[in-house]
Amino acid sequence: MICRVWHGWTTLENADAYERLLESEVFTGIANRRIEGYRGIQLLRRAHDSEVEFVTMMWFTSLEAVRAFAGDDYTRAVVPPKAQSLLARYDQRSAHYDVREDQR
């Protein structure tokens, strides 16, 4: 199993709108692609003094499945234009981890 981890930050004012966009459009759009080997996504949120940090953790069965999602340059962040407009900054690259243990 591969976990794809990415970070983005919004202003305090844009945080709720960004989260709604993810849940209503972005995550649904990913699921609707029916990528073989895609196993879901988790969203983490943490408020800081002047911004809100979001972390996505996507789950795939293999790097081939990650490539089916992100393309050959699979570490490149996939951030739709609507999402970019609500973000103050974001990682240009995603990190990929081999899941060694999962007791969820």
Which positions does each model-derived feature cover?
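Non-catalytic surface loops within mature trypsin-like serine protease
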Residues: 12, 60-62, 98-101
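An amphipathic, aromatic/His-enriched active-site/gating alpha helix that lines ligand/cofactor pockets
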Residues: 24-36, 59-95
